[in-house]
Structures are given as C-alpha cells and as structure tokens.
C-alpha cells in the first residue's frame, strides 16, 4: 500500500462511519394494530393507532404511512394520555408530525428528561374551522445528549378541537425543514383596507392582527403561498395611523403569503363584482368568502337588515363573523361589511336581532331605540352575548357579556322576540341535553340582559326535529286575527304549531314538514316589520356551491309565511314575496290555452338568465305536465299528485281540482312553489350558460291552463 494514500483511506473510513452513525432513529411511526410498548390511559387514544379520520372528524391528512395517533376516539370530550418507553437521546433533533387542537396546558406532545417536561408542542387550531392536517415540527435536544427520556402525548382538553394528531417521531442530526413559526410583519395603517391573498384549498394558517400591541382578531386563512385565487379584504380604517402587526402561526420557508399582503384605498373586489359566471342574479350572496345561516333579520330605520354567518377569509366554512347587508325593498341588497368579529369569547355563531322600542336594555341613545343583536359566542365555554347599535351601521358589544352562561357545550342560536301580553322578552335557544337530545329552552327577560329559564320543549329522539337555529313566531290562521297560533321550527324547517302563554309552548301538532326540497337550512324570519305590513317573511340558507368562484353559497328569495287551514289542521304556506315582481323585464303569457301532447312550446321565444314561470291549470286527461327552465325539469305527475324537481320528489295534491306552480330559476338553483304554497321545493342546480330556455309540455293527454306566464328577470345587482 502506498503510504501516501493511508491518511485518505482513514479519513474516508471515519467519514463513512460518521454518516452511518448519524442515520435517523425512528422512535415511533404508529403502524400496525397496537401501540406496542406505549402505555395508554383514559379513552382518548383507544387501544391502537388510527388509520386516518375517526367518526365525526374532518378529513385527516399529512401523516406518514397508514397509521397515526389520533385522540379523537369518542370525540372531543374524551381524555387520556399515551406514554412511550424510555429511550436514549442520541441525535441533535427530535422531529415529529403534529396537528389537531391548540392548548398549551392541556393538549400537547411532551418530552420528559429526569421526570421533568423539557419540551412541549401543541396543535395549530384554536377555534371552529381549521384543518386536521399534520405538519412537520422539531426540537433541538442536543443539550440532553446521552440522557434517557420519555415522550408523553396528553389530551386533557374538552370541547371543540379537544384532540391531538401525532405521527412519525424521529431522532435526527439533520434539522428538519419545518415551517417558520409566528412570522410577523409590521404595517403602518395609512389606507383603509388590507388585501390578503387567498388560495382555495391551501393549508389554513392562523393570521392574527395586533394594533399597538393589542390582539384584535385572529382567523384561519387559506393564505396563498404565491399567486392567489382571490383577495380577501380586511377593513382597517378604524386604526388609521396606528402600528399594525400581522402574525402567521406557521409558514413554509418558501411561502410569499405574508409578503403579498398590501394596503389599498379601495377593496380589491371592486373588479368584476356581481358579474361572475356563477353569481346568482336573484339570490343574495356575499361579495367574497363563504356564507351560511341568515342571522339577525330585522326591520330598522326603514331598512331590512340581513346579517349572516360569514367567512370573509375563505371559500369554505370557518372564522365565523356576522356579515351585514341592507335593503329597502327585500330585493336589492347592499353589503356593508362585517359587524361582529371573533373575540376572546370565540367565533360569532348564529342569533337574532330586535328593536328595543322601550329601551328596556338601556342601550338606546338620545331617544333612539337600539337595535340589539343576540348571538352565540362559540368558544369554550359557549355563551350567549349581545351587541347594540342606534344607527344600524356601527355596533358595540355589551361590556357585561355574556348575558347567558353555558348550559351545555351544545347551546346556541338564540332567537328573541317581544311578548306583548307579558311585557317581557322571550328567547328560544337550542340546547343539546345528555339523554334528552335536541331541546329548545325558553327564557324570559325584562331587559335583554338578565334571563330566567321558563320552560323546555323536547324534540323527538333519533331525529333532527328541532335541531339548532330555532325560530318562534305567531300567525293568524287563514288571516283571522282571532284564530292565532304559534309556530316553533328548527334548522331543517320541520315545525310545530301550538299555543304559548308567555312561558310555555304547548304543541298541538308536532314535527310537521316544512320545505320539501334540498339545500335549504337554518331559515329565520324578520322581526319588527311594520304593523301595517304585518307579514312574516323568511329567508333560508340556500346551499349553492360555486366552485372556482371567490364566494360560496347564497340565500333563498324572501318567502312570505302564512298558516292555512287543511283537513289535517293548520299548516305553513311558503310563497315568494310580492316585491320580486319588480324584477320582471317582460311578460310572455299563454293564459286560457289548452295544451295537448305534442303541441308547440308556447314559450319557445323566451330567453332569460334568471326566470320566473307561473302556471295554474286543471290537469284534465294529461299524465304529466312538464316545465323546463334552463335545462332543469319540473314534472307534475297527475296520478300520484306529486312534484318531481330535477329528480327530487315532493307531494303536491290538487286543490279544488287545480294545481298552481311558480318557479324561480337562477344560475345556481330553482325554487318551486305548488299547492298555493303548501309545497315548497328549493333545489340547487347549475344550468349550462348557453341554455336560457323555458318550455311547457304535456304528456299523454291535455291540460287546461287558466294562467300560464313567463317572465325574464332583471338582476338584483
């Protein structure tokens, strides 16, 4: 051997040995049918690793292989721990994947050395929404080299996000390329808006706004790492001239998301607003982001106020704010911006609004009665709160919140009304009770601040009857003011009819079907409509998914509710409000015609992006009467006395030998009314852009039409 090569060979050998010595050491990857030598206590972790999402859990991703630790076993209220056998610390870093809830004291992965916790990590999610994805994190443990240690996964948390996901725990000498933590950017507020880049489907980041060092609001944001799909708008006009700091909890090393945020004098959404291809033209939807339940519907200062569950920073559910829009005619709406933002009590869940005409709350000013919002703050605990305004634009949360403490974790959605005979406020509140299931609690108050339980109405076991978002109101039967009944309904619009003495509701008819369609949920009615008007007007959440857009979901058209006598007792009727007639651009009619099978389409020349069709007919010898609106099919089956709306069936009996049908068609769905409003069938549907046709057809005989009219409609925008 050449002596000159010996040092080189020795160096090569030592280097090779060093590389081998530095190979990663897997502590646990949670594959297989058991936890092995790890010791579990309690119920949260079960007896073996999970293989992904557990029942009732959002999709879990980002874990390694087929298994992971998931403490959602038996839901968020289960607790327990999972402890590893002892191991020697032999590498500089301890790397792991972690996700789930964020609670530094009750929900964490712990490293213990000499029996003491020396490192701890928790998940990213604090409030409703968020993501179950696991992300890479690590600790520098070089100071403990050679010492014995154990790992302990602790779940002592209950309620929302009361669980942790952990996987792939590894010792390594290579620092993992984990995300940057608590990344900040300072901004001097000079313009009224911040534009935040959003990428639909991107991992959610926790974005927190601080003003002069004080935390203002935090949101889960699908922050675009590069080119955004759209821009969310944050109004910062209240803090002009102040020092703002934006903080993101985790960011990939290469993400530009925080750098892309910029100030502007006008919202970035002033571009093609309301002209987007899937924007409903007769259904309200927010400028940007997600909406669900209508909230706080009230008539105040000569305006209809529509508040709604809103995520201004994402296309999907989360970050619950109260959005706000107003209208003078129930048809044309102006969105004003969010009025209730998440706070230390939690995200802003559903509720109602009233005008406190007598200023019982003391929240009025200079003789102006306050509008009072009553809402659920869905933190831990989940409580009921109020906010007020004397101008219908600026709202102040009550300093004495909450006005009603948590009963159970499943209490929410207060609907409040004034009960004139007892001179008290009445609240109906959804409460999920152990062993009793869905209930509605009735509370009374002299001032909207102090509430006393008056009674409880039970739902029906193993059903969704009276599940969440209750509404409660009085209506005359057949318009007769001396024959009035109270209606209690839940989110799916099933309802009860009965009497109310100011404290207790006594149902005479229970679990009656409301709407008969699909994609309709959490309807609410307006309070404080003028006495000379006297209508009970309802709007529901219309579940119209609009993929590829910067907004998602919408509201139904406003509906007038009445109680009508039937052989089975009083029943609700649903009819579109008369104000919608103002949208008619032109009238096409074929009144008085008898149509036979094979006759030409009387509306073959009609075209419309949004359309209204009305028909009253005697079916005669016809087997079916068929309406086509922008490619959707509405069939009346004469023998079955049944309506079939794009394949969805609903009972529709003749009334005095006749049938009446009204159809509203839009870019995102249909709303169909039959039987003088006793049958209401909403149905999300997306027509082809080029199909703007209307067609009426008779199968197997003839039908006589007393009324047959089609109206192309103007846009509400």
Spell out what each predicted region is.
Residues 77-79, 87-95, 146-148, 188-195, ...:
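Extended extracellular/luminal ectodomain segments enriched in beta-structured repeat modules
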Residues 112-163, 179, 197, 202, ...:
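Extracellular carbohydrate recognition and processing domains
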Residues 119-131, 175-178, 215-231, 256-295, ...:
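Surface loop/turn signatures of beta-propeller and other carbohydrate-active proteins
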Residues 96-97, 152-153, 196, 246-247, ...:
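Hydrophobic core segments of beta-strands in well-ordered, beta-rich domains
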């Amino acid at each position: 051997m050449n002596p000159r090569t010996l040092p080189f060979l020795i160096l090569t050998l030592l280097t090779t040995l060093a590389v081998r010595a530095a190979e990663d050491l897997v502590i646990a990857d949670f594959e297989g049918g058991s936890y092995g030598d790890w010791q579990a206590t309690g119920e949260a972790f079960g007896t073996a690793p999970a293989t992904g999402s557990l029942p009732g859990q959002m999709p879990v991703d980002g874990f390694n292989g087929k298994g992971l630790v998931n403490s959602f076993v038996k839901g968020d209220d289960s607790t327990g721990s999972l402890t590893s056998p002892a191991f020697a610390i032999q590498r500089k870093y301890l790397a792991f994947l972690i996700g789930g809830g964020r609670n530094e004291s009750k929900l964490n992965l712990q490293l213990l050395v000499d029996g003491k916790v020396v490192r701890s990590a928790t998940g990213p999610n604090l409030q409703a929404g968020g993501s179950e994805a696991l992300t890479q994190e690590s600790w520098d443990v070089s100071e403990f080299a050679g010492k014995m240690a154990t790992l302990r996964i602790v779940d002592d948390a209950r309620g929302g996000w009361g669980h942790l996901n952990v996987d792939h725990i590894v010792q390594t000498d290579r620092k993992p390329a984990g995300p940057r933590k608590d990344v900040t950017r300072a901004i001097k507020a000079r313009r009224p808006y911040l534009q935040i880049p959003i990428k639909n489907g991107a991992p959610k980041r926790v974005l927190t706004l601080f003003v002069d060092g004080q935390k203002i609001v935090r949101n889960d944001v699908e922050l675009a790492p590069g080119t955004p799909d759209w821009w969310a708008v944050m109004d910062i006009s209240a803090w002009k001239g102040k020092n703002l700091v934006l903080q993101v909890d985790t960011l990939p090393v290469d993400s530009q998301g925080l750098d892309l945020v910029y100030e502007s004098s006008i919202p970035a959404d002033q571009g093609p607003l309301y002209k987007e291809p899937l924007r409903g033209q007769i259904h309200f939807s927010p400028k940007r982001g997600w909406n669900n339940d209508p909230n706080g519907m009230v008539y105040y200062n000569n305006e209809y106020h529509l508040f709604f569950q809103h995520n201004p920073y994402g296309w999907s559910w989360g970050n619950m704010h109260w959005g706000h829009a107003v209208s003078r005619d129930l048809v044309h709406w102006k969105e004003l911006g969010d009025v209730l933002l998440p706070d230390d009590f939690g995200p802003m869940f559903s509720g109602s609004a009233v005008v406190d005409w007598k200023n019982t709350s003391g929240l009025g000013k200079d003789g102006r009665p306050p509008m009072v919002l009553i809402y659920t703050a869905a933190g831990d605990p989940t409580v009921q709160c109020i906010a007020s305004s004397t101008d219908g634009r600026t709202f102040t949360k009550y300093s004495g919140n909450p006005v009603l403490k948590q009963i159970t974790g499943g209490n929410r959605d207060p609907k409040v009304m004034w009960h004139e005979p007892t001179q008290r406020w009445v609240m109906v509140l959804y409460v999920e009770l152990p062993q009793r299931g869905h209930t509605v609690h009735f509370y009374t108050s002299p001032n909207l601040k102090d509430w006393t339980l008056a009674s409880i109405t039970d739902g029906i076991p193993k059903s969704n009857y009276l599940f969440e978002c209750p509404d409660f109101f009085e209506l005359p039967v057949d318009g007769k003011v001396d024959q009035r009944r109270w209606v209690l309904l839940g989110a799916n619009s099933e309802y009860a009819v009965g009497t109310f003495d100011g404290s207790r509701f006594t149902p005479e008819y229970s679990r009656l079907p409301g709407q008969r369609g699909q994609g309709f949920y959490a309807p609410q009615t307006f309070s404080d409509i003028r006495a000379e008007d006297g209508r009970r007007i309802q709007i529901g959440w219309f579940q119209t998914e609009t993929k590829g857009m910067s907004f998602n979901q919408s509201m139904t058209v406003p509906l007038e509710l009445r109680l009508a006598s039937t052989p089975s007792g009083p029943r609700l009727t649903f009819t579109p409000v008369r104000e919608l007639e103002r949208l008619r651009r032109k009238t096409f009619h074929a009144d008085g015609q008898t149509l036979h099978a094979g006759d030409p389409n009387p509306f073959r020349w009609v075209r419309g992006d949004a359309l209204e069709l009305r028909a009253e007919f005697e079916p005669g010898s016809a087997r079916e009467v068929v309406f086509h609106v922008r490619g959707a099919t509405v069939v009346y089956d004469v023998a079955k006395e049944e309506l079939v709306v794009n394949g969805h069936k609903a009972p529709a009996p003749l009334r005095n030998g006749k049938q009446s049908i009204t159809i509203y068609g839009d870019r995102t769905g249909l709303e169909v009314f039959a039987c003088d409003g006793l049958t209401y069938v909403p149905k999300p549907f997306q027509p082809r852009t080029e199909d703007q046709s209307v067609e009426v057809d008779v199968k197997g005989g003839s039908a006589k039409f007393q009324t047959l009219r089609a109206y192309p409609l103007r846009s509400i925008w």
